[in-house]
């Protein structure tokens, strides 16, 4: 085997994950991303920065840009979920989650923020949102995400945006399950512009704190004439403050709003499934027991250390080891798991 062919080396305290640079390949059409993922994981949580700003060097679908992240871009519009790495066509990158401050603004071009303090390592990503003073962090299990937002004092919000994403497919629905839980489905597909290759992705979301307020939004069609005169949300986003059961459409979303204290941390976790919402909840409850972001992060790091350290090398420089272990890291992202914890597997072809 390759492991046997290489010389085993390294000190007991050295970690091979220290040599992984998740930012390698995130520029010049390298098509990778620095998001949090476990080896061969179905879930990945990636900073989404390819829409909404004239400052972006590359935008979604610009010159075949096919990933949710570009290293040169600095306009964060949320974490996207279930992302592809190393592919040449845009797909997935679904269900954006975004913390903000102040009045709820559902338009990603307005609520998006520049960011600083970016850092990534296997199984973990973080940055600071300049517009809000919010620190965002993400990690993952095989089928679920764990996200932590550290807020300043004021009105803090968590937005769940179903309208935007990397996929060229549109449409979905959301349902309020409880004050702290929502579920839904987002259509995906048309990979490499195959218009009939479509499929649903189901999700289950839980937040760690009950909001003071919450609700759906939906972008309304542009009307003309008399209808336009009596429609206050004509061509804009309608905020549903009294209706709160379920909603469907293309440009839809949900918000949780809080009165946050300085430094208050609120967590969000998401389970996904390509079979059903029931399976998404089952995946979430099986892989995360309550809210324990740091424990999930530690487990993700340990899974990468275990898989990558199957091959230990000596000789060469630290830069050589970075090249080797970063390439091995990327090789262990795909192919990825698609079955749920109960063993059910999606039908990937059209019915």
Task: Report residues per predicted region.
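Accessory carbohydrate-recognition regions in carbohydrate-active enzymes
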Residues: 14-351
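Bacterial N-terminal signal peptides
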Residues: 1-9
């Amino acid at each position: 085997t390759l492991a046997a062919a290489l010389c085993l080396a390294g000190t007991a305290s050295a970690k091979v994950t220290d040599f992984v640079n998740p930012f390698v390949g995130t520029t010049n059409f390298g098509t990778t991303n620095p998001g949090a993922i476990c080896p061969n994981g179905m879930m990945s949580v990636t900073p989404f920065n390819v829409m909404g700003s004239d400052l972006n060097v590359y935008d979604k679908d610009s010159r075949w840009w096919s990933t949710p992240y570009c290293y040169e871009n600095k306009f964060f519009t949320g974490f996207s979920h279930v992302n592809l790495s190393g592919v040449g066509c845009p797909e997935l990158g679904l269900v954006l989650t975004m913390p903000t401050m102040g009045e709820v603004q559902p338009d990603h071009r307005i609520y998006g923020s520049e960011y600083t303090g970016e850092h990534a390592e296997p199984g973990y990503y973080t940055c600071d949102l300049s517009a809000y003073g919010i620190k965002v962090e993400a990690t993952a299990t095989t089928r679920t995400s764990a996200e932590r937002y550290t807020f300043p004092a004021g009105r803090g919000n968590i937005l769940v945006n179903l309208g935007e994403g990397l996929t060229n497919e549109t449409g979905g629905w959301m349902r309020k399950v409880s004050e702290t839980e929502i579920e839904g489905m987002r259509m995906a597909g048309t990979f490499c512009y195959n218009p009939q290759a479509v499929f649903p992705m189901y999700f289950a979301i839980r937040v760690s704190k009950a909001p003071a307020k919450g609700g759906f939004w939906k972008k309304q069609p542009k009307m003309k004439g008399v209808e336009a005169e009596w429609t206050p949300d004509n061509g804009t986003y309608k905020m549903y403050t009294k209706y709160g059961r379920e909603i469907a459409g293309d440009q839809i979303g949900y918000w949780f709003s809080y009165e946050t204290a300085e430094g208050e941390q609120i967590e969000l976790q998401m389970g996904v499934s390509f079979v059903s919402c029931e399976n998404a909840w089952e995946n979430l409850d099986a892989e995360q027991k309550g809210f324990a972001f740091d424990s999930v992060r530690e487990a993700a790091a340990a899974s990468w250390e275990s898989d990558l350290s199957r091959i230990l090398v000596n000789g060469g420089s630290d830069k050589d080891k970075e090249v080797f272990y970063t390439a091995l890291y990327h090789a262990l992202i795909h192919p990825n798991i698609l079955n749920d914890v109960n063993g059910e597997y999606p039908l990937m072809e059209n019915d």
